[in-house]
Amino acid sequence: MQPVQILTLVLLALGAWAAQESTEKAGYCPDFRQVLLDRRDCKQLCNDDASCPQNMRCCQRGCSWLCMNTTQEKDGLCPVATSHSSSSEEQQRKQLCDKTCKTDLGCEGKAKCCASSCGQTCFMPVKAKPGRCPAVTGICPEKKSWFHTCQRDDQCKENKKCCSSACGRRCTNPFPEEYEASQDESTLLAL
């Protein structure tokens, strides 16, 4: 093969890889409650959303990565319930106890169905922090414990986002929004 042909193939492969990296499907991975895990049962059946068929996403379940059907939720995050509520916030919560729900679709407008002291009720969502979580690579080492230090962005200090890692969800410095756009542009320029 000529060097020009080899270079062209390499650039095409890199372009396809970069495009695959940025593919994220709509919807969310279903909630998962961690139980004791036998690490011998760990499986990596997908690497990212692009490796899953149709609308399925690559979701972490314990130490395994599986293609799963997503849950459809409204934008934003449920607010974190605090024990130090002001009287006006407490009054608002009591009013909301009359508006129970099962899913986001049961709430009017932009409100989300969130856990509260009176069950599932409708709340106005908290916005996710800007930026993009880094891609998850590898699997959690056998000797390292697997756990979440956060569930949502609003539980992370400063600009950090709550992102998946090989060993659970952690507060992480995100890539800026422009990072994804500049990667797409460089891929197009390379082709």
From Swiss-Prot:
It comes from the Eukaryota. The gene is WAP. Disulfide bonds join C29-C59, C42-C63, C46-C58, C52-C67, C78-C114, C97-C118, C101-C113, C107-C122, C133-C163, C140-C167, C150-C162, C156-C171. Could be a protease inhibitor. InterPro entries: Elafin-like_sf, WAP_dom, WAP_four-disulfide_core. SMART domains: WAP. It is found in: Secreted. Pfam families: WAP (PF00095). GO terms for cellular component: extracellular space. Residues 1-18 form the signal peptide. Glycans are attached at N69. Keywords: Disulfide bond, Glycoprotein, Milk protein, Protease inhibitor, Repeat, Secreted, Signal. Transmembrane segments: none annotated. This is Whey acidic protein. One of its GO terms (molecular function) is serine-type endopeptidase inhibitor activity. Milk-specific; major protein component of milk whey. Residues 22-71, 72-125, 126-175 form the WAP domain.
